[in-house]
From Swiss-Prot:
SMART domains to which the protein is assigned, alphabetical: WD40 (SM00320)
Biased composition (Acidic residues): 789-800, 1032-1048
Function per UniProt: Negative regulator of NOD2 function. It down-regulates NOD2-induced processes such as activation of NF-kappa-B signaling, IL8 secretion and antibacterial response. Involved in JNK signaling pathway.
Compartment(s) where it occurs, according to its Swiss-Prot or TrEMBL record: Cytoplasm; Nucleus; Cytoplasm, Cytoskeleton, Spindle pole
Protein name: Mitogen-activated protein kinase-binding protein 1
Source organism: Homo sapiens (Human)
Lineage, highest ranks first: Eukaryota, Metazoa, Chordata, Craniata, Vertebrata
Length: 1514
């Protein structure tokens, strides 16, 4: 049937082509074919069906076909066997259909210039291709004669093509005016029907004409007469079969099943929902056979109707409820028993197998069920599978545990995490998991357990799939989901980090959550446990907030250290042990690599930097090869760079991708260190030889970028996960597996040699130097920085495979090994040069850890064993293990409800209320219903034997469990007589003007015909295709890094109903990986999830860092412990639930950052309000001398994020006005203006300060030490970063006692004192809606205090205050004083100004005429504030002057107030004189005169009263 090269042109080209060209091309083709055949796709765990058009069934063999990314999965429900067709074009499969004989499969794809392809099902090869669409193929169908194929394009294409695929010509074509969702051929092949938005159209084929004409003819179409249903969205259509072959059935999104007659008239319809139910409001799909009509509806409902009269027959059982614990569903009663108030996924696709009477259903949580419907009253489940419904972010293989009795999961298990907010435990081996605590469930043969992170079931549904009940995008949190997972080396703990920055640890034995802490302010990109060979039990978490937290897993995950050298997102962090030292390596989007060495620090361990390497490209991922000698880093320029861990030098570089476009996203080495696998943003996977850099295999099949990869422990598989929600299990070639196992055997041989020459040690080591790591912690490693140009280092790199020195040193090292080593002692490079012939050894005994698991799940590789549940050895293992964990395992925290008083979390982490333990999934031991004898593999590489057929394994419900409904609940309705005749009288004029007519309606009218799904019909034409991703991933310039990251919601990972997978849907890379570099560039904020409170470790660390005058080493757990627990406050402070929005009630709207760099005066405004509102803090005198004007700028803090906090603090601390002012003055005294000791401003230390990474970028040639903050020259103040933390309400931070030094920043500015103008120029108008009554208790007094000193700062000028202990200017000016800028405040006479430097002069004040008009409201507010402030001043003076034995400080306060009163009186007299001496004025001036007179009169009365009372007391 092959038609490739069948045209005349191609035949001539083949004849004229020379044999040499043919030979060269065939060699290149063979090379490519050889690379792609090394690794084969064995299993797909995922489904990307987007509607009824994406699911098909072979009517003869029963094969079910569905898309999974760029792969078509051919599934046999009877044998549970998969076959795969890979789309070599790398375009997502959107629609497919079988030919009537089942030999061929037609597929449609998305993207630009998509193709309709015909595949040979048996050969899995392409036989024909048509490329006549532009923007995606919506649906395809074979004609019953298999002669024609109909394909319909997406809305922006709107082309209907009839293709004679064997001749490779389009015989008929036309356009449609509406979005088409489905197509169906009539049984006699005379017409086909398309359905869509307000669209049912019948297209007629004249076979006599199309067969005679070789050119394309117009396709004739007639619209269906919809009558009163013309405004509906028809989601699916199916032509009748058998006796109803002349009828056409379709469903609407509103839940109607309609029947059209052969005259295209709407004959009758029935409402799919019954009277008493509200769950089936939406219908998605339909499937029609001779006996049944199946309608897929919302909430997992499938209705069965009789096609002859549309009478209701029955309702199929619903699938699992959302949030079901599948490990507990081990019996049929658990599946078919309804759960009260449960929510079920929608049915989005149906296909019927008439031979077996099986109905396959796909639901919008990406699950698939096959139901046996031979008896509609007793429906049984044949097969089911549950998959991730959104992007899969990470995959981890369950480690090989030395003591198999301590293993929590069976061998070959792996763990994935996803944006659907679940962590899933998988095991694809054919043998059962009955030896573990988890039994096989009846819902999935591959899925062991689902860990639901929270109770939100909305994340389990794919909202991009069709459905009328789509969730509002504003209600969905775009950062929901688990971003990274990691399993502890002993297999007991599972750590996970979500996209909100929360770190969780689950205990795998009971699958209960044992720890939950808000560790970061942004998503956690990487988690890593240290190996036991390091002697440490550490967990490192790295985040987009550029911080690394190191937790001690052996001490209940207490915080050991926080590292902040990186200046951007950290993409990877790894532990290693080399040269007797424990190392930590991290890389990130700031193009830096840090090599750190562990040092003993009291009871814990601290990491200090030893090497710092900077490259010119973003570093996306890193892995350490098994010998821990070298680390491989995947870079943005598609290169893999190999670094020596001990020296930090680059040793090798090779290309990590076969393509010329894209970016390396992930790198992963195999267990032996021979191969390294890479994933590129062009969606391709490659495997390279680690020593030579030669590509040995390539793979493709994912429709989105691969976000994670792992080799299996048995060296037989590579598991890849992707943004398309699919998991691919790849089978490696036999020679690759042999080479890896041979390398592991050589390592075991060397390990045994080391054992004979050295005493054994309780420490388990895997290399000559690993066991020494705990005792060889460096007291102070030498610092180095490799920031030279990359070319120089690479030009002098050493060829590691050609170094015989390594082999010699290896032999010496082996001779001195004092403890047993793991089979990963030496790198492949060293082994390849050792020239030792070690054959493929027999597996080691069970006591020796090797690549083969030993214990209760042992699977012999040679002999054929028959195993069953009746085996005595298996029965013994069914009893729960009561043995204590091994000594090297992590301490297991009890999984019960945890209290706030646990020591570890008191000292380092914020205590959290933990959930009660989940019930164990294990059920009481019982014999299975079916005993299968499963044979094991014969040899290592024999294909898995197929499981036994399951005719008897269908799960049926109890008779009482089957829901029955009265047929009368579904009433068939028909249009009234004359209705259709009145609307459509049969004249052709009405048909010509039908909205569905392609001939009479303008092409652009389709934009008005899809109101129900506006987002589905929109499509961006921006060329962002991943195929040309190299242009999108160009390294940003330094200036570009200043741009703010705009990361929107999560990009769609599945297919979208009604719109193709065009470039706007392929922004996955740009949204989640390219933004790693731009998100945390200097001057741009790190995009942080919105929280009502910020309790994360990162926030507390950044808050504490603000108190450091110079950059110091990161705090240990003891130093951070002081800030870990906020003070207890009344519940009135109001913890707002997460997701309530950016602003708390009464909080100001967000202030947009200015385009220019904020001035230092604006920068100072971050510190002062915090200092003033913590007057009772114990100030640290040791830091007075090192204080600087900007040393208090805190990291990750916005200039306008303090406003809601300030109001919150003011509400918590509400003493009497006199006491409040006295406290403020005490705060002044503690914050007096002292310049730095050297007379120069110290460098600022805010969140955007130059980190080690950014300094290395600025100056690559200098050698940077650890104390980079000790710079003598004054540094330019870094611009204030408007962090998204500004969106948070910060009540918890308000109670932390800040260790801020006493000296106030020298010469504070007006912008520093106003809580309203943070982030704005002083004269900028206030945004409307801001509460103006903020801080009335302080504001006027503060202004009077400042006026008493005679300082009236102008915009962007500085005010010099007294350098003494009392600095009245260190108060805040009122809100009202900023309505028109500080010019409203009249300055005092020059002779009365006590400061040596005057900020303004009387003549500098603006005239009244040049000012905007003062409103009455403003004036009244000013008067009220003035009265309140004077009262407060008087009360304060009375309280101070009334003391019989005043202290020196009280005497100073009294003198200060007297001077202030005198100064204010003189000011008012001067103002009154100016007003009286002015000539006739305008009406506006008259109002000003009245105001001034009123103020003068009132002030004089108050002052006289004060003087009288003072005279009485004196």
């Amino acid at each position: 049937m092959a038609v490739e090269g069948s045209t005349i042109t191609s035949r001539i080209k083949n004849l004229l082509r020379s044999p040499s060209i043919k030979l060269r091309r065939s060699k290149a083709g063979n090379r490519r074919e050889d690379l792609s055949s090394k690794v084969t796709l064995e299993k797909v765990l995922g489904i990307t069906v987007s509607g009824g058009r994406g699911l098909a069934c072979d009517p003869r063999s029963g094969l079910v076909a569905y898309p999974a990314g760029c792969v078509v999965v051919l599934f046999n429900p009877r044998k549970h066997k998969q076959h795969h067709i890979l789309n070599s074009s790398r375009k997502t499969i959107t629609a497919l259909a079988f030919s009537p004989d089942g030999k061929y499969l037609v597929t449609g794809e998305s993207g630009h210039m998509p193709a309709v392809r015909v595949w040979d099902v048996a050969e899995h090869s392409q036989v024909a291709e048509l490329q006549e669409h532009k923007y995606g193929v919506a649906c395809v169908a074979f004609s019953p004669s298999a002669k024609y194929i109909v394909s319909v394009g997406y809305q922006h294409d709107m082309i209907v093509n009839v293709w004679a695929w064997k001749k490779n010509i389009v015989v008929a074509s036309n356009k449609v005016s509406s979005r088409v969702t489905a197509v169906s051929f009539s049984e006699d092949c005379s017409y086909f029907v398309t359905a869509g938005n307000r669209h049912i159209k019948f297209w007629y084929l004249d076979d006599s004409k199309t067969s005679k004409v070789n050119a394309t003819v117009p396709l004739l179409g007639r619209s269906g007469l919809l009558g009163e249903l013309r405004n509906n969205l028809f989601t699916d259509v199916a032509c009748g079969r058998g006796k109803k072959a002349d009828s056409t059935f379709c469903i609407t999104s509103s839940g109607l099943l309609c029947e059209f007659s052969d005259r295209r008239l709407l004959d009758k319809w029935v409402e799919l929902r019954n009277i008493d139910s509200f769950t089936t409001t939406v219908a998605h799909c339909i499937s029609v056979s001779q006996d049944y009509i199946f309608c897929g509806c919302a909430d997992g409902t499938v209705r069965l109707f009789n096609p002859s009269n549309l009478h209701f027959l029955s309702t199929l059982p619903r699938p699992h409820a959302l949030g079901t614990d599948i490990a507990s569903v081990t019996e049929a009663s658990r599946l078919f028993s309804g759960v009260a108030n449960a929510r079920y996924p929608d049915t989005i696709a149906l296909t019927f197998d008439p031979t077996n009477q099986w109905l396959s259903c796909v639901y919008n949580d990406h699950s698939i069920y096959v139901w046996d419907v031979r008896d509609p009253k007793k429906v049984g489940k044949v097969y089911s599978a549950l998959y991730h419904s959104s992007c899969v972010w990470s995959v981890e293989v369950y480690p090989e545990v030395k003591d198999s009795n301590q293993a929590c999961l069976p061998p070959s298990s792996f763990i994935t995490c996803s944006s659907d907010n679940t962590i899933r435990l998988w095991n694809t081996e054919s043998s059962g998991v009955h030896g573990s605590t988890l039994h096989r469930n009846i819902l999935s043969s591959d899925l062991i357990k689902i860990i639901y992170v929270d109770g939100n079931t909305q994340a389990l549904l794919d909202t991009e799939l069709p459905g009328g009940d789509k969730a509002d995008a504003s209600l969905l949190d775009p950062r929901v989901g688990i971003r990274s997972v990691c399993v502890s080396p002993n297999g007991q703990h599972l750590a996970s980090g979500d996209r909100m920055g929360t770190l969780r640890v689950h205990e795998l034995q009971s699958l209960s959550e044992m720890l939950k802490v808000e560790a970061h302010d942004s998503e956690i990109l990487c988690l890593e446990y240290s190996k036991p060979d390091t002697g440490l039990k550490l967990l490192a978490s790295a985040s987009r907030d550029r911080l690394i937290h190191v937790l001690d897993a052996g001490r209940e995950y207490s915080l050991q250290q926080t590292l902040d050298e990186h200046s951007s997102s950290i993409t990877a962090v790894k532990f290693a042990a080399s040269d007797g030292q424990v190392r930590m390596i991290s890389c990130g989007a700031d193009k830096s690599i840090y090599f750190r060495t562990a040092q003993k620090s009291g009871d814990g361990v601290q990491f200090t930097r030893t090497h710092h390497v900077v490259r010119k490209t973003t570093l996306y991922d890193m892995d350490v090869e098994p010998s821990w000698k070298y680390t491989a880093i995947g870079c943005q320029d598609r290169n893999i760079r190999i670094f020596n861990i001990s020296s930090g030098k680059q040793k090798k570089l090779f290309k990590g991708s076969q393509g010329e476009d894209g970016t390396l996203i992930k790198v992963q080495t195999d267990p032996s260190g021979i191969y390294i696998a890479t994933s590129c943003s062009d969606k391709n996977l490659s495997i390279f030889d680690f020593s030579s850099g030669e590509c040995v295999a390539t793979m493709f099949g994912h429709s989105e970028i691969v976000t994670g990869m792992k080799f299996s422990n048995d060296c037989k598989h590579l598991i890849s996960v992707s943004g398309d929600s699919c998991i691919f299990v790849w089978r490696l070639s036999s020679e690759m597996t042999i080479s890896m196992r041979q390398r592991l055997a050589e390592l075991r041989q060397r390990q045994r040699g080391g054992k004979q020459q050295g005493p054994s040690s309780p420490q388990r080591a895997s290399g000559p130097n690993r066991h020494q790591a705990p005792s060889m912690l460096s007291p102070g490693p030498a610092l180095s920085s490799d920031s030279d140009k990359e070319g120089e280092d690479e030009g002098t790199e050493e060829e590691l495979p050609a170094l015989p020195v390594l082999a010699k040193s290896t032999k010496k090292a082996l001779a001195s090994v004092p403890s047993p080593a793991l089979p990963r002692s030496l790198s492949h490079w060293e082994m390849s040069r050792a020239q030792e012939s070690v054959g493929f050894l027999d597996p080691a005994p069970a006591a020796n850890p090797g690549p083969r698991r030993r214990g209760r799940w042992v699977q012999p590789g040679v002999e054929l064993s028959v195993r069953s549940m009746l085996d005595l050895r298996q029965l013994e293992t069914l009893a729960p293990s009561l043995q204590d964990p091994s000594q090297d395992s992590l301490a297991i925290i009890p999984s019960g409800p945890r209290k706030h008083g646990q020591e570890a979390l008191e000292t380092s982490l914020t205590s959290q209320n933990e959930k009660p333990p989940r019930p164990q999934a294990s059920q009481p031991c019982s014999y299975p219903h079916i005993i299968r004898l499963l044979s094991q593999e014969e040899g290592v590489f024999a294909q898995d034997l197929e499981p036994a057929p399951i005719e008897d394994g269908i799960v049926y419900p109890e008779p009482s469990d089957n829901p029955t409904m009265d047929t009368s609940e579904f009433q068939v309705q028909a249009p009234a007589r004359g209705t259709l005749g009145r609307v459509y009288p049969g004249s052709r004029s009405s048909e010509k003007h039908s909205p569905d007519s392609a001939c009479s309606v303008d092409y652009s009218s389709s934009c008005l015909s899809s109101p129900e799904h506006p987002t589905e019909d929109s499509e961006s034409t921006e060329p962002l295709s991943v195929d040309g991703i190299s242009s999108d991933l160009e390294e940003p310039a330094e200036g570009d890094e200043e741009e703010e990251e705009e990361e929107g919601g999560m990009g769609p990972y599945g297919l979208q109903e009604g719109s193709p997978q065009t470039p706007d849907q392929e922004q996955f890379l740009k949204q989640h990986f390219e933004t790693l570099a731009s998100g945390a560039a200097p001057g741009a904020p790190v995009q942080v999830p919105e929280r009502s409170e910020s309790r994360s470790i990162s926030s507390r660390f950044l808050l504490q860092v603000q108190t450091r005058p110079l950059r110091e080493p990161s705090p240990s757990s003891s130093s951070l412990a002081l800030m870990s627990r906020p003070a207890q406050v009344p519940q009135a402070s109001g913890e707002q639930p997460r997701g309530n929005g950016a602003n708390p009630p009464g909080a100001p709207p967000e202030v947009e950052p200015s385009s220019g760099n904020p001035s230092p005066q604006q920068a100072a405004s971050v510190l002062l309000p915090r200092c003033r509102l913590n007057p009772d803090s114990s100030w640290a005198p040791k830091r007075v001398a090192t204080a600087s004007p900007f040393s208090g700028l805190q990291k990750a803090q916005s200039v306008h994020s303090l406003v809601p906090q300030e109001r919150h603090e003011a509400s918590l601390q509400a003493p009497s006005p006199g006491a409040l002012l006295s406290r403020e003055i005490e705060a002044q005294d503690g914050l007096g203006s002292l310049p730095p000791a050297d007379g120069r401003p110290s460098r600022p230390h805010s969140y955007q300060n130059p980190t080690t990474s950014s300094m290395a970028k600025i100056s690559r040639s200098i050698s940077v030490g650890e104390n980079l903050g000790l710079v003598a020259e004054p540094q330019a103040h870094a611009p204030i970063r408007v962090s998204p933390l500004s969106k948070l309400a910060l009540p918890s931070r308000a109670h932390l006692v800040l260790d801020i030094p006493k000296p106030l920043p020298d010469r504070p500015t007006l912008a520093a004192f106003s809580p309203v103008t943070k982030g704005r120029a002083p004269g900028e108008a206030e945004k409307p809606g801001f509460p103006v009554g903020l801080g009335k208790a302080h504001s006027t007094t503060e202004r009077w205090a400042c006026l008493g000193e005679g300082t009236t700062p102008k915009p962007r000028t500085e005010c010099q205050a007294h350098p003494g202990p009392s600095s009245p200017c260190a108060q805040q000016l009122p809100v009202s004083s900023l309505f028109q800028g500080p010019e409203n405040l009249q300055p005092p006479p020059p002779e009365k100004t006590p400061n040596p430097m005057e900020c303004t002069k009387p003549g500098a004040a603006l005239s009244q005429d040049s000012e905007p008009a003062v409103s009455l409201e403003q004036c009244e507010q000013l008067v009220a504030e003035l009265r309140g402030s004077v009262r407060q001043a008087v009360r304060l003076y009375h309280s101070v002057a009334g003391c019989k034995m005043p202290s020196a400080e009280q005497s100073r306060i009294a003198q200060l107030l007297r001077d202030t009163f005198s100064s204010v009186r003189q000011e008012l007299e001067a103002v009154a004189g100016a007003v009286l001496s002015s000539p006739g004025s305008s009406p506006g001036a008259v109002g000003a005169e009245q105001t001034q007179a009123l103020l003068e009169q009132y002030s004089e009365l108050l002052l006289r009263a004060v003087e009288r009372r003072m005279e009485r007391k004196l």
